């Protein structure tokens, strides 16, 4: 975690979910803009404070998933896993909730504290849609779910309060439990990671990525015993979507 005086928060979400607009509401015009090391993707940082705590905000690129197929996805993964992000604020378009939740389930597997910011709630209300704000957190493992509107600037204090509280409380962990065959393989792979890379944290996420034959993870954490034919990416993806359908 970061220092006692500062909490580092990563804002992440699908493209066009209103993430950057919400980020800018908190940070104003006082932004630090540069490129992520080695790539042309912009890195945008800002700061805010709440109840005497300084909060550094990082606006991560808009992505749909945490694969390693695009530069934006690689940048986001690297930042979350290696740059001491204390809390993840996952901004979602509440009017297209099902489409946005795939990324949420992936983030929960990374072992970091996640807060779901339901943006565009004003649009949900205008369209007469309903979201069960009691059931949704339960189905996502008890993570904070905060309705906000970047456009109307509502729910901002509640979101910052959730950041402080969830920072102290820690991660809720993964909510998707796969079929027994895959769960057994995840457990076996975690044990191998423990043997070969004992200091590696969030081993479940890395184990899942290895079973998906994620090229970047395979390069950094090769396990010779993993068969090249062993690729469970489709099953893992499908079971995530099955879980979302239940929501």
Residue locations for each model-derived region?
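Conserved G1/Walker A P-loop phosphate-binding module
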Residues: 1-69, 82-83
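Solvent-exposed alpha-helical segments within well-ordered globular domains of core cellular machineries
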Residues: 24, 46, 58, 71-78, ...
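Catalytic cores of large soluble enzymes that bind and process phosphate-bearing ligands
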Residues: 33, 64, 68, 95, ...
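Conserved nucleotide-binding/hydrolysis micro-motifs of P-loop NTPases
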Residues: 38, 62-63, 94-98, 120-125, ...
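Conserved C-terminal guanine-recognition region of P-loop GTPase G domains, centered on the G4
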Residues: 46-51, 75-145
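Canonical P-loop GTPase G-domain recognition
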Residues: 122-177
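Extended helical scaffolds that flank P-loop GTPase cores
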Residues: 144, 169-247
């Amino acid at each position: 975690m970061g220092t006692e005086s500062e909490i580092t928060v990563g804002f992440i979400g699908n493209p066009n979910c209103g993430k950057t607009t919400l980020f800018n509401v908190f940070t104003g015009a006082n932004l630090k803009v540069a490129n992520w090391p080695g790539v042309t993707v912009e890195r945008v940082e800002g700061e805010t404070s709440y109840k005497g705590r300084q909060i550094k905000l990082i606006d991560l690129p808009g992505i749909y998933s945490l694969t390693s197929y695009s530069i934006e996805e690689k940048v986001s993964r690297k930042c979350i896993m290696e740059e001491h992000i204390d809390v993840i604020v996952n901004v979602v378009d509440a009017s297209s909730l099902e489409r946005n939740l795939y990324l949420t389930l992936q983030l929960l597997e990374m072992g970091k504290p996640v807060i779901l910011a339901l943006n565009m709630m004003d649009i949900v209300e205008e369209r007469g849609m309903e979201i069960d704000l009691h059931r949704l957190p339960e189905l996502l493992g008890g993570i904070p779910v905060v309705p906000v509107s970047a456009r109307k600037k509502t729910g901002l204090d509640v979101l910052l309060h959730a950041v402080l509280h969830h920072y102290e409380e820690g991660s809720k962990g993964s909510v998707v439990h796969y079929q027994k065959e895959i769960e057994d393989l995840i457990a076996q792979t975690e044990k191998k990671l423990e043997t070969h890379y004992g200091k590696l944290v969030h081993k479940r996420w890395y184990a899942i990525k290895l079973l998906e034959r994620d090229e970047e993870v395979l390069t950094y954490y090769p396990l010779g015993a993993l068969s090249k034919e062993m690729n469970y990416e489709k099953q893992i993806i499908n079971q995530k979507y099955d879980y979302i359908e239940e929501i």
